[in-house]
């Protein structure tokens, strides 16, 4: 059966969600020759994955995942990564500010894949324990208003295709479906994507997964975040249907600097940058975090518009609430270690 699906994809045909689901199951559980599996994933990437295919793969992976009962509506800021622009870890800093504004956050993430650091690397450098069991993750959420869900821990089945993905050395459907697999099944999400051709498909998949509202963002400069330099295209999806609009930072009073001004570094350097933002240091890093936080607050219904969200984010940072949220996250996550 796999050969039939491989032939279809190579010839440019699309799989429906059931066929994609079955293919994912075969890749994860059957002894598919690596050359055929690589050919399938490469062909899928070449002609771009569809909403049906993403949905089928996500359904297969969710069946294998360790799920978390968060007990409340949560928001996630996990993106695909892979834009190659070297900016600091914006989504992690934004997640902390969002939580300090009173929105519960379940941050799904991983270590670095294509860049220098991932969200797990940065949080560890900040002193947060990232490898938490489901009940521990729930307790951290209850106590700090934010938790972290380390993707490999909740999706161990992906080890089955780890060698294949490393050998290919290119982004595959597994990269783009990662942010769709939060084991808390969040109600709200801001998802940055590195491939603009997949924005609509990912937005549609999020809608099928039951998100109340999600923003799928890709900047015109290639950034997989809301960019402070130039416009960002937004696919806004949820119970209201689908809307597409652009965010222009200049109209919001942000800009005048290039992406060179928000570069990251290794995990330690990135952690220092996050702390500077949370401590209220003015400049491009702060402006970028405030802009992305505002979009998350809009998504979760906490802010009526981006402008109001920016004001709320700035006030939370300046009042010390965002730094306090990080300190709680560090303390309560480390309490788990001391209790072991």
From Swiss-Prot:
This protein is called what? Anthranilate phosphoribosyltransferase
Q: Recorded E.C. number(s)? A: 2.4.2.18
Q: How is the cofactor bound?
A: Binds 2 magnesium ions per monomer.
Q: Which gene encodes it?
A: trpD
* Subunit and partners: Homodimer.
**What's an example GO BP annotation here?**
L-tryptophan biosynthetic process
Q: Which cofactor does it need?
A: Mg(2+)
Sequence similarity: Belongs to the anthranilate phosphoribosyltransferase family.
Which residues of this UniProt protein bind Mg(2+) 2?
Answer: 224-225
Q: In which pathway does it act?
A: Amino-acid biosynthesis; L-tryptophan biosynthesis; L-tryptophan from chorismate: step 2/5
Q: Which Gene Ontology molecular-function terms are recorded?
A: anthranilate phosphoribosyltransferase activity; magnesium ion binding
Gene Ontology cellular component terms for the protein in this record = cytosol
Which Pfam families does this one have? Glycos_trans_3N, Glycos_transf_3
């Amino acid at each position: 059966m796999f050969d039939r699906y491989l032939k279809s994809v190579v010839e440019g045909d699309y799989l429906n969600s059931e066929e994609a689901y079955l293919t994912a199951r075969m890749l994860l559980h059957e002894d598919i020759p690596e050359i055929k599996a690589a050919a399938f994933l490469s062909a899928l990437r070449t002609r771009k994955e569809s909403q049906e295919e993403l949905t089928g793969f996500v359904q297969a992976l969710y069946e294998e995942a360790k799920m978390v009962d968060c007990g409340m509506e949560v928001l996630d800021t996990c993106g695909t990564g892979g834009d190659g622009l070297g900016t600091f870890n914006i989504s992690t800093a934004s997640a902390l500010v969002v939580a300090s504004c009173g929105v519960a956050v379940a941050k799904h993430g991983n270590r670095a894949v294509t860049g220098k650091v991932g969200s797990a690397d940065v949080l560890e450098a900040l002193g947060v324990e990232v490898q938490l069991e489901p009940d521990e993750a729930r307790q951290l959420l209850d106590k700090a208003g934010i938790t972290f869900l380390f993707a490999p821990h909740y999706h161990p089945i992906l080890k089955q295709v780890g060698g294949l993905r490393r050998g290919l050395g290119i982004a595959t459907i597994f990269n783009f479906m990662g942010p769709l697999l939060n084991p808390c099944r969040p109600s709200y999400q801001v998802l940055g994507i590195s491939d603009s051709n997949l924005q609509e498909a990912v937005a549609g998949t999020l809608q099928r997964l039951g998100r109340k509202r999600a923003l799928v963002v890709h900047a015109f400069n290639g950034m997989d975040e809301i960019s402070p330099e130039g416009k960002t295209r937004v696919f806004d999806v949820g119970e209201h249907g689908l809307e597409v609009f652009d965010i222009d930072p200049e109209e919001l009073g942000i800009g005048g600097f290039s992406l060179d001004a928000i570069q990251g570094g290794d995990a330690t350097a990135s952690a220092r940058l996050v702390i500077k933002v949370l401590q209220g240091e003015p400049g491009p890093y702060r402006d970028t975090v405030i802009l992305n936080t505002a979009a998350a607050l809009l998504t979760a219904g906490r802010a009526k518009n981006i402008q109001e969200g920016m004001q709320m984010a700035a006030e939370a940072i300046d009042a010390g609430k965002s730094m306090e949220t990080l300190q709680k996250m560090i303390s309560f996550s480390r309490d788990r270690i001391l209790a072991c």
